[in-house]
């Protein structure tokens, strides 16, 4: 290790500040673990774990209104690698699709010039992973290919569209929230636009419903909300309702099919779309803080809610196995009256002011255990959920909230108490399934009650609001290389100075120094600076001047001018001399002051008649070198004096020594030699004065008369033999002091605000700042190098400029950002892999595709050579060292908890696959391995149960640890049936019109609940037009099971009905006579595949149900449907493991196929026959080839050797390296 390492590499970057009102909803948390948000016209990308800025994307010319990460719901391989794709949309209607890692725009899309209302990637990525749907105001939805920028189709609707939501269970369902209501689209397809206008329904706002108001006076708000039965009507409500449509948000619930939430400021309504009615209300008490936003979770039926005070709350659906009533009212006979979401955790609120308020919240889509809050001042706060096992006695049972239990499983597999687990990995590993009504927890199972709490684990602060005064620390030299840090001091309008480290872009120190706006900063060394601030003038035009000297390491600051500063003319500028010895303080209406920086003493206050200064600059020349030479001579003479006899010393020499010894004693190591320095300044008439300062003497040396071609001089810069002056009229005058020539250049850019030379010996570049931008000049050639003009090539106005290094400039701008740019001043995004980060970031997406896939294989196939290791050098991976180092950095950046799991021999292959899919944010694999782990484990339980105990024991375990209901038809039949029964109970309790009652009756008949169906049919009132029909139906239902002939009649009638377009009625009749299998076949014939699957799950025995679902699998795999990933999950739920392996192999998912085969063999899920053997070896051989293509030799050898005869040739090839490189 080197004794010191100094990192002064500074890459181009942008420091961002407060957001714009347009950016309010522009934030997204990607599956890759990165958060992107809009800041004015920029898109900022940060890491959610370390809260570091990784990328700032700049290309939009207007404020960004939406950002969306592409989904990762596809199989990743070399052809479809892990990559960071992001779509951002602005107020001018432009959509840009970015390759975030490279910082380049892949494609730009423009349809109209109005703000994009909403944009989303299609979640079903089997056919294409490049499709993006956008709302172009006022009423168009357009489907784009985001890879090529091609418009696939466009469709307009009658009303203005505000936002939309895709059904997470069915890619053909889309719902639009419009200015008047909701439009349901049921034929969404990438290949053609939706056909009709969609099904339009109106929302009457809960506040405006007259029934609601009436009830509210009678019984309290909670009861009233329970009675809000219908919200969705086909009829347009009367005028006073429409104006009150204050629905903030609409979203499908990913936790259960056909449910949707509507968000209002004071309540969240949960709708069941099968009956179009409210089945749950989350209301805020009168004193509570209104909602701003809600994000529904797919795991555990949870809701993340953001409130107006910046507080984030988590609510989880209550389980009904232990209901207690909290009031004196009589308990309800049927406990499930309402879908209730209990408050389980909340984080701290923020201090809301006029300028600081919460903008938006996003939630981690992979684990759903963390939320990020974006605040208008540019802060991003990352809150993580943590679970703690709590003591039974400590629980407050009077709260009426059922307890939460930790789940039985970890990473998909039930684990023992002593096994390693990481409960905070994800929401479903923190809390178990909410039990369904009447479901008791199994005896003897280890259920530990848990509490959840939010912890602030990341905070990113933005720059405060402009104005800014910026100053870069002194430049890097050979002398200061050991302690140099590239620090930028930023003075702000609230009086504080922020110091940023420009290698990492992170805030190094924040110092509250002044009580008013900082006007200027000058560094006096690498670790100290002077800053000045002036208060607002009083009626005499006088101010309070604050000039502070700040020591950066300690943060200590002293008033540099002591007691001076109250009620005087404002300081205009401060200038520190080249050797940091002297300070010139220039006032508006008061003579110049000269100070000694080292002793903080006033050297000279100029007389009253001293000219008014308009610009001042110190000369880079001084006499320190000649002083140092004299000093060195002294030392040598002194050294000689000790050796040589006195007589040999000349008298002259000894007299010089005595003089210099005096100087030497005053300053150890030449610290306080007062060298002679000089400065120039100009007065109002443009006359140039030249003054010399040495110690405490100030001499006036020369004056140069004004140049007629120049206006009033505003600034001066001096380097080497070049002096440059700028004036009010935009002229630059270049003086060559050696050649004694001057050259004036009119820039035609009005007032020259500031000019400054670049650091570095012989570097004669100069930056000039104007009211409308900046320019870089080469003073040697007297030529402009680059120019930037507000309104022409950038949208922002420049507030201050400086040099960062010899080839990079710093611009502070009125959009609240500070940009470090190349000399060309072109806004450039950077390559993320070139960036210097203070903390390592886990993001395999940043690696080249080959490396990210090799890293995944390395993690999945542990142990290597019988050893669990996270050291990449332990395996044979003949890749270049740079890539290996990058892989090792990724491995090192994993948290200790994750490392512990990966190195645990008890951690099974299935758990490892699930963990790695979470680490990679791979949506497709996460769902595949969740379902695979569940059913492979169930199979092994059944096997062990059948050998040791009576048959009844096996299903018991299935219900105690079921697959989460968000997996819908993939769940076990018994659990799915219970859920559907609970749902129909709820629908029944909530019904309020005949239409709803009829829908409930239909559901009850399909579910085989004939008694309750008959009760509902007999409720039809005599004046209803369906009274006769319903009465007959009730008679039919009660007598239907009696005789054989009646069954054949009913079957005939049912088939006729179906043939004549009455599919639902015919299916119902078939279910009445227990011919549900036929009903399913008819539904499938008529394209109602989802309905058929539902009916099979609730009515058929396992064999018949499997038949129906297998036909569905064939349909899903057909080219016109192309939903093979869904088909795989259905096959897993049926236990058709061999078919899954075959399908994976045919889809060329070799990695997943090989891992799945290994897991199946471990669980004994395959009968090993000749056929299976053939498939297994083919899978292993193909996987070995793909690992060879990744350059992962050891993995390839491992699987080639497992493949037997099929892998023999490959094995030989791998083990005998050829002379010439193999072409891939």
From Swiss-Prot:
InterPro entries: WD40/YVTN_repeat-like_dom_sf, WD40_repeat_CS, WD40_repeat_dom_sf, WD40_rpt, WDR11. One of its GO terms (biological process) is cilium assembly. It comes from the Eukaryota. WD repeats lie at residues 59-108, 111-154, 354-393, 471-510, 566-605, 708-745, 747-787, 793-831, 893-940. SUPFAM superfamilies: WD40 repeat-like. Disulfide bonds: none annotated. Changing residue 690 to Q: In HH14; abolishes the interaction with EMX1; decreases capacity to shuttle from cilium to nucleus; decreases interaction with EMX1; decreases GLI3 protein levels. GO terms for cellular component: axoneme; ciliary basal body; cilium; cytoplasm; cytoplasmic vesicle; cytosol; intracellular membrane-bounded organelle; lysosomal membrane. Keywords: Cell projection, Chromosomal rearrangement, Cytoplasm, Cytoplasmic vesicle, Cytoskeleton, Disease variant, Golgi apparatus, Hypogonadotropic hypogonadism, Intellectual disability, Kallmann syndrome, Nucleus, Phosphoprotein, Proto-oncogene, Repeat, WD repeat. It holds the Pfam family TPR_WDR11. Ubiquitous. The modification Phosphoserine is found at residues 205, 209, 402, 406. It is found in: Cytoplasm, Cytoskeleton, Cilium basal body; Cytoplasm; Nucleus; Cytoplasm, Cytoskeleton, Cilium axoneme. It is linked to A chromosomal aberration involving WDR11 is found in a form of glioblastoma. Translocation t(10;19)(q26;q13.3) with ZNF320. A chromosomal aberration involving WDR11 is found in a form of Kallmann syndrome. Translocation 46,XY,t(10;12)(q26.12;q13.11). Component of the complex WDR11 composed of C17orf75, FAM91A1 and WDR11; FAM91A1 and WDR11 are required for proper location of the complex. Interacts (via the N-terminal and the central portion of the protein) with EMX1. Interacts with GLI3; the interaction associateS EMX1 with GLI3. Interacts with TBC1D23; this interaction may be indirect and recruits TBC1D23 to AP-1-derived vesicles. Involved in the Hedgehog (Hh) signaling pathway, is essential for normal ciliogenesis. Regulates the proteolytic processing of GLI3 and cooperates with the transcription factor EMX1 in the induction of downstream Hh pathway gene expression and gonadotropin-releasing hormone production. WDR11 complex facilitates the tethering of Adaptor protein-1 complex (AP-1)-derived vesicles. WDR11 complex acts together with TBC1D23 to facilitate the golgin-mediated capture of vesicles generated using AP-1. This is WD repeat-containing protein 11. The lineage of its organism: Eukaryota, Metazoa, Chordata, Craniata, Vertebrata.
């Amino acid at each position: 290790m080197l004794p010191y390492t100094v990192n002064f590499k500074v890459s181009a970057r942008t420091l961002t500040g407060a957001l714009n009102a347009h950016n309010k909803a522009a934030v997204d948390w990607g599956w890759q673990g990165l958060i992107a948000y809009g800041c004015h016209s920029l898109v900022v990308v940060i890491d959610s774990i370390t809260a570091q800025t990784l990328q700032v994307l700049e290309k939009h010319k207007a404020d960004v209104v939406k950002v969306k990460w592409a989904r990762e719901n596809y199989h990743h391989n070399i052809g479809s690698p892990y990559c960071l794709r992001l779509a951002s949309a602005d107020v001018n209607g432009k959509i840009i699709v970015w390759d975030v890692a490279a910082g380049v725009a892949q494609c730009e899309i423009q349809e109209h010039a109005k703000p994009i209302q909403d944009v989303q990637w299609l979640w079903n990525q089997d056919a294409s992973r490049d499709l993006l749907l956008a709302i172009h105001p006022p009423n168009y939805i357009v489907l784009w290919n985001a890879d090529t920028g091609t418009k696939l189709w466009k469709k307009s609707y009658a009303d203005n569209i505000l936002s939309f939501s895709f059904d997470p269970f069915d890619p053909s369902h889309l719902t639009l929230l419009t200015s008047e209501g909701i439009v349901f689209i049921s034929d969404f397809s990438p290949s053609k636009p939706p056909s009709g206008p969609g099904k339009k329904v109106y929302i009457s706002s809960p506040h405006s419903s007259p029934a609601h108001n009436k009830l509210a006076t009678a019984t309290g708000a909670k009861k009233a909300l329970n009675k809000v039965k219908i919200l969705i009507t086909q009829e347009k409500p009367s005028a006073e309702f429409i104006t009150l449509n204050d629905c903030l948000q609409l979203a499908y619930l990913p936790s259960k099919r056909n449910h949707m939430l509507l968000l209002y400021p004071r309540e969240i309504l949960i709708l069941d779309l099968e009956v179009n009615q409210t089945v749950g209300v989350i209301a805020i008490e009168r004193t509570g803080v209104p909602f701003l936003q809600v994000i529904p979770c797919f795991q555990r039926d949870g809701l993340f809610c953001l409130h107006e005070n910046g507080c984030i709350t988590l609510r989880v659906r209550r389980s009904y196995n232990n209901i207690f009533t909290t009031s004196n009212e009589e308990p309800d006979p049927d406990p499930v009256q309402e879908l209730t979401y209990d408050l389980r955790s909340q984080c701290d609120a923020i201090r809301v002011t006029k300028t600081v308020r919460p903008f938006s919240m996003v939630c981690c889509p992979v684990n759903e255990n963390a939320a990020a809050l974006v605040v208008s001042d540019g802060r991003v706060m990352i809150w993580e959920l943590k679970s703690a096992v709590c003591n039974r006695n400590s629980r407050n049972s009077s709260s009426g909230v059922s307890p939460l239990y930790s789940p039985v499983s970890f990473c998909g597999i039930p684990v023992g108490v002593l096994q390693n687990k990481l409960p905070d990995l994800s929401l479903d590993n923190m809390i178990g399934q909410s039990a369904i009504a009447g479901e008791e927890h199994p005896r003897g199972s280890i259920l530990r009650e848990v509490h959840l709490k939010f912890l602030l684990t990341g905070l990113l602060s933005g720059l405060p609001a402009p104005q800014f005064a910026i100053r870069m620390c002194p430049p890097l030299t050979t002398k200061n290389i050991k302690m140099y840090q590239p620090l930028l001091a930023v003075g702000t309008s609230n009086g504080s100075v922020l110091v940023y480290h420009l290698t990492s872009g992170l805030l190094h120190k924040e110092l509250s120094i002044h009580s008013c706006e900082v006007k200027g900063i000058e560094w006096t060394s690498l670790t100290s600076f002077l800053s000045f601030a002036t208060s607002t003038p009083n009626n005499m035009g006088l101010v309070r001047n604050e000039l502070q000297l700040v020591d950066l390491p300690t943060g200590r600051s002293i008033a540099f001018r002591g007691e001076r500063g109250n009620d005087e003319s404002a300081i205009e500028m401060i200038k520190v001399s080249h050797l940091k010895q002297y300070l010139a303080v220039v006032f508006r209406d008061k003579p110049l002051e000269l100070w000694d920086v080292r002793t903080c003493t006033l050297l000279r206050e100029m007389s009253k008649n001293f000219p008014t200064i308009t610009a001042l600059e110190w000369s880079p020349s001084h006499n320190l070198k000649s002083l140092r030479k004299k000093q060195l001579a002294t030392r040598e003479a002194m050294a000689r004096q000790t050796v040589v006899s006195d007589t040999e010393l000349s008298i002259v020499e000894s007299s010089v020594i005595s003089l210099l010894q005096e100087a030497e004693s005053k300053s150890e190591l030449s610290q306080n030699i007062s060298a002679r320095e000089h400065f120039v300044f100009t007065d109002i008439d443009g006359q140039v004065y030249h003054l010399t300062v040495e110690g405490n003497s100030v001499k006036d040396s020369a004056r140069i008369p004004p140049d007629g071609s120049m206006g009033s001089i505003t600034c001066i810069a001096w380097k080497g033999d070049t002096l440059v002056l700028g004036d009010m009229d935009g002229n630059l005058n270049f003086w060559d002091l050696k050649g004694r020539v001057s050259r004036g250049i009119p820039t035609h850019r009005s007032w020259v605000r500031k000019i400054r030379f670049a650091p570095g010996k012989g570097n004669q570049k100069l930056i000039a700042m104007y009211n409308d931008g900046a320019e870089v000049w080469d003073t040697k050639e007297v030529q402009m190098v680059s120019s930037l003009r507000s309104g022409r090539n950038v949208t922002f106005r420049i507030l201050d400029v400086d040099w960062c290094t010899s080839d990079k400039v710093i611009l502070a701008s009125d959009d609240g950002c500070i940009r470090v740019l190349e000399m060309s001043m072109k806004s450039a995004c950077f390559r993320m892999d070139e960036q210097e980060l203070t903390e390592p970031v886990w993001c395999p997406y940043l690696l080249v595709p080959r490396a990210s896939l090799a890293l995944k294989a390395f993690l999945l196939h542990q142990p290597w050579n019988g050893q669990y290791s996270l050291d990449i050098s332990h395996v044979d991976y003949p890749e270049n060292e740079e890539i290996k180092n990058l892989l090792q950095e990724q491995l090192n950046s994993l948290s200790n908890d994750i490392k512990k799991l990966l190195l645990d021999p008890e951690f099974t292959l299935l758990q490892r696959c699930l963990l790695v899919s979470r680490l990679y944010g791979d949506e497709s694999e996460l769902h595949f391995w969740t379902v695979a782990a569940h059913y492979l484990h169930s199979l092994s339980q059944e096997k062990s149960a059948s050998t040791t105990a009576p048959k009844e024991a096996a299903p018991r375990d299935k219900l105690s640890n079921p697959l989460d209901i968000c997996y819908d038809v993939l769940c076990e039949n018994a659990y799915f049936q219970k859920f559907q029964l609970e749902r129909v109970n709820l629908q029944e309790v909530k019904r309020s019109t005949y239409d709803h009652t009829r829908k409930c009756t239909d559901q009850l008949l399909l579910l085989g609940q004939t008694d309750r169906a008959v009760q509902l049919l007999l409720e039809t009132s005599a004046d209803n037009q369906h009274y006769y029909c319903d009465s007959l139906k009730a008679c039919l239902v009660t007598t239907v099971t009696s005789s054989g002939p009646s069954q054949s009649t009913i079957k005939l009638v049912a088939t006729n009905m179906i043939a004549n377009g009455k599919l639902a009625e015919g299916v119902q009749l078939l279910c009445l006579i227990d011919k549900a299998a036929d009903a399913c076949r008819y539904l499938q014939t008529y394209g109602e595949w989802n309905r058929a699957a539902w009916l099979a799950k609730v009515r058929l025995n396992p064999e018949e149900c499997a038949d129906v679902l297998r036909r569905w699998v064939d349909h899903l795999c057909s080219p016109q449907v192309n939903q093979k990933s869904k088909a795989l999950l259905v096959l897993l739920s049926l236990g058709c493991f061999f078919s899954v392996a075959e399908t994976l192999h045919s889809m060329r998912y070799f990695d997943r196929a090989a891992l799945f085969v290994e897991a199946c063999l471990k669980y004994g899920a395959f009968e090993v026959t000749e056929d299976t053997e053939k498939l297994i070896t083919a899978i292993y051989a193909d996987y070995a080839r793909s690992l060879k293509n990744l350059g992962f030799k050891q993995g390839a050898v491992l699987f080639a050797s497992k493949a037997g005869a099929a892998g023999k040739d490959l094995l030989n090839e791998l083990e005998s390296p050829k002379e010439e490189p193999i072409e891939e």
